[in-house]
UniProtKB/Swiss-Prot annotation:
PANTHER family: INTERNAL ALTERNATIVE NAD(P)H-UBIQUINONE OXIDOREDUCTASE A1, MITOCHONDRIAL, NADH DEHYDROGENASE. Belongs to the NADH dehydrogenase family. The keyword Transport does not apply. One of its GO terms (cellular component) is mitochondrion. It comes from Arabidopsis thaliana (Mouse-ear cress). This is Internal alternative NAD(P)H-ubiquinone oxidoreductase A1, mitochondrial.
Length: 510
C-alpha cells in the first residue's frame, strides 16, 4: 500500500510539472505560433491543390466573353455609344453577327439639341436614346450584350480587350475586370473637350458634351438666380453670380448663347423680375465666331446676338480661377456659370494606344476605316483621322461625319459577313469594294429669337444655298425633328417645344 501511495505522489508531481511547463507564457506562445503556421500552410496547400485541379479540369476557363467557336456567329465589339458607334449598332445585320457594346453610358445623346436642355426648352430624356432601342438584339439575342464599362487595355494580337466596370464613385461597389474576345473591333470612343493646357479649366468650367453636363449647367444657372435674390448679398457678388460666360464661338457655343438669351428675355424677366436687369451673357472667342459659315451669315449672327444682349469678346483665355478668368491682355472676367466649348481633342485612352496617329493625334485609318497596323480593328468618329499616307485631309469632328462613317462601316461588315469574312483574320485578302467618301451636307445653327442659320454649301469656298432668319429657324427645327433617332424621341421633342411655347420653360431645380 505504501508503494502505491508513493507512486500516486510521483504521478501528481510529474503531471503538475508538465502542466506548469505548458502554462509558461513563452512556451505557450512558441507552440501556438508553430501550430498556427503549420495549419495555415496546410490550408494554403489545400487551396492551391484545388485550384490546380480546377485548372486541369477546365483548360478553357475565360474571365469574360471567350472567342467565338465554329457554329457561333462572329462577334463585333463596339467601344463607344456616340453617333458613330450607335450607327454601326443600328445598321449591322444581327442574323450574321453578335454585337457587343462597351460604354460608360447606356444611351446615345442627340447633341444638336443638347443646348436646349440647359434652359428647359427640352427635357433631358428627349435627347437621349437607349442603346437597347437602337439595336434590339442587345436585349434579345443570347450572344449580344451591352456592358457598362470602360476599356482599359487593347490586345490586338490576341483579338481581345480588357475592360473595367463603371461604378460612378460608389464606395460599396468595386470595379470588376473582365475580357472580351472579338472577331471585329470598332473603336468609336469619341474625343474629349480641348482645354489647351489652360490652368483651371477642368476644375472650374462646365463642358457641354453629355446630358449630365447639361444638368449641371441648368442646376448652376437656377441656383445662381435664386441666390442672387437673397437679402444682404453684395452688389458685386450678385453681378458675378448672374454673369454667364461662354468660351468658344463654334456652333455649340453660339447655340447655347442664343438659348440662354431667349431664356433670359422670356422667362427670367417674368419670374425673376428682381434681378432681370443684372443677368448678362458674354461669349469669348479667340477668332471669328462660326468660322465655317458664310461671311454674310456670320455677320447676321453677330448682329442678332448683340440684339439679344449677348456681349461678344475677342480674346484668348490664359487662366481660369474659381470665380474669374483672365484673358491674354490681362482683363479679368468674373463669372457665375462658365461653359467651355472650344472643340475636341484625342482622349487619354486614344493617346495610350500604340497605333499610328494622324497629325492631330487621333487613331490613323485608311479609306476603309481600318487601322492598317493590326488585323480586324476599325476606327470611326471623332477618335479617328486619315493617315497622311492616304493623301486625304482629316474630316471635321461633326455628328454627320460620325454617323455616315458608322453607316458605311455597318454596310461593309454586312458585305464581309455574307462573303465569309466575318471571323477573325478571315478578311486579309478580301476586296472591300468602294472606300468611304464624305460629302458635306451643310451646316445649321440656331441663334435665338426664332432665328437660325442654314448653310448648304459643300465647303466654305463652294457654291450653294445659304440663308438666315425665321425661315431658316423653321428649317432647322424641321430637320432636327426628323433626324432624332426614334419616333419616341420625336414625340418628346415636339411636345416639349409645344409646352415651352405655350407655358414657358420649366425653371424647377431638381
Amino acid at each position: 500500500m505504501l508503494w502505491i501511495k508513493n507512486l500516486a505522489r510521483i504521478s501528481q508531481t510529474t503531471s503538475s510539472s508538465v502542466g506548469n511547463v505548458f502554462r509558461n507564457p513563452e512556451s505557450y506562445t512558441l507552440s501556438s505560433r508553430f501550430c498556427t503556421a503549420l495549419q495555415k500552410q496546410q490550408v494554403t496547400d489545400t487551396v492551391q491543390a484545388k485550384e490546380d485541379v480546377v485548372n486541369a479540369l477546365e483548360p478553357q476557363r475565360y474571365d469574360g466573353l471567350a472567342p467565338t467557336k465554329e457554329g457561333e456567329k462572329p462577334r463585333v465589339l463596339v467601344l463607344g455609344s456616340g453617333w458613330a458607334g450607335c450607327r454601326v449598332l443600328k445598321g449591322i445585320d444581327t442574323s450574321i453577327y453578335d454585337v457587343v457594346c462597351v460604354s460608360p453610358r447606356n444611351h446615345m445623346v442627340f447633341t444638336p439639341l443638347l443646348a436646349s436642355t440647359c434652359v428647359g426648352t427640352l427635357e433631358f430624356r428627349s435627347v437621349a436614346e437607349p442603346i437597347s432601342r437602337i439595336q434590339p438584339a442587345i436585349s434579345r439575342e443570347p450572344g449580344s450584350y451591352y456592358f457598362l464599362a470602360n476599356c482599359s487595355k487593347l490586345d490586338a494580337d490576341n483579338h481581345e480587350v480588357h475592360c473595367e466596370t463603371v461604378t460612378e464613385g460608389s464606395s460599396t461597389l468595386k470595379p470588376w475586370k473582365f475580357k472580351i474576345a472579338y472577331d471585329k473591333l470598332v473603336l468609336a470612343c469619341g474625343a474629349e473637350a480641348s482645354t489647351f493646357g489652360i490652368n483651371g479649366v477642368l476644375e472650374n468650367a462646365i463642358f457641354l458634351r453629355e446630358v449630365h453636363h447639361a444638368q449641371e449647367i441648368r442646376r448652376k444657372l437656377l441656383l445662381n438666380l435664386m441666390l442672387s435674390e437673397v437679402p444682404g448679398i453684395g452688389e458685386d457678388e450678385k453681378k458675378r453670380l448672374l454673369h454667364c460666360v461662354v468660351v468658344g464661338g463654334g456652333p455649340t457655343g453660339v447655340e447655347f448663347s442664343g438659348e440662354l438669351s431667349d431664356f433670359i428675355m422670356k422667362d427670367v424677366r417674368q419670374r425673376y423680375s428682381h434681378v432681370k436687369d443684372d443677368i448678362r451673357v458674354t461669349l469669348i472667342e479667340a477668332r471669328d465666331i462660326l468660322s465655317s459659315f458664310d461671311d454674310r451669315l456670320r455677320h447676321y449672327a453677330i448682329k442678332q446676338l448683340n440684339k439679344s444682349g449677348v456681349k461678344l469678346v475677342r480674346g484668348i483665355v490664359k487662366e481660369v480661377k474659381p470665380q474669374k478668368l483672365i484673358l491674354d491682355d490681362g482683363t479679368e472676367v468674373p463669372y457665375g456659370p462658365l461653359v467651355w466649348s472650344t472643340g475636341v481633342g484625342p482622349s487619354s485612352f486614344v493617346r495610350s494606344l500604340d497605333f499610328p496617329k494622324d497629325p492631330g493625334g487621333r487613331i490613323g485609318i485608311d479609306e476603309w476605316m481600318r487601322v492598317p497596323s493590326v488585323q480586324d480593328v476599325f476606327a470611326i468618329g471623332d477618335c479617328s483621322g486619315y493617315l497622311e499616307s492616304t493623301g486625304k485631309s482629316t474630316l471635321p469632328a461633326l455628328a454627320q461625319v460620325a454617323e455616315r462613317e458608322g453607316k458605311y462601316l455597318a454596310n461593309l461588315f454586312n458585305v464581309m459577313g455574307k462573303a465569309g469574312g466575318g471571323r477573325a483574320n478571315s478578311a486579309k485578302e478580301m476586296e472591300l469594294g468602294e472606300p468611304f467618301v464624305y460629302k458635306h451636307l451643310g451646316s445649321m445653327a440656331t441663334i435665338g429669337r426664332y432665328k437660325a442659320l442654314v448653310d448648304l454649301r459643300e465647303s466654305k469656298e463652294g457654291k450653294g444655298i445659304s440663308m438666315a432668319g425665321f425661315l431658316s429657324w423653321f428649317i432647322w427645327r424641321s430637320a432636327y425633328l426628323t433626324r432624332v433617332v426614334s419616333w419616341r424621341n420625336r414625340f418628346y421633342v415636339a411636345i416639349n417645344w409645344l409646352t415651352t411655347f405655350v407655358f414657358g420653360r420649366d425653371i424647377s431645380r431638381i
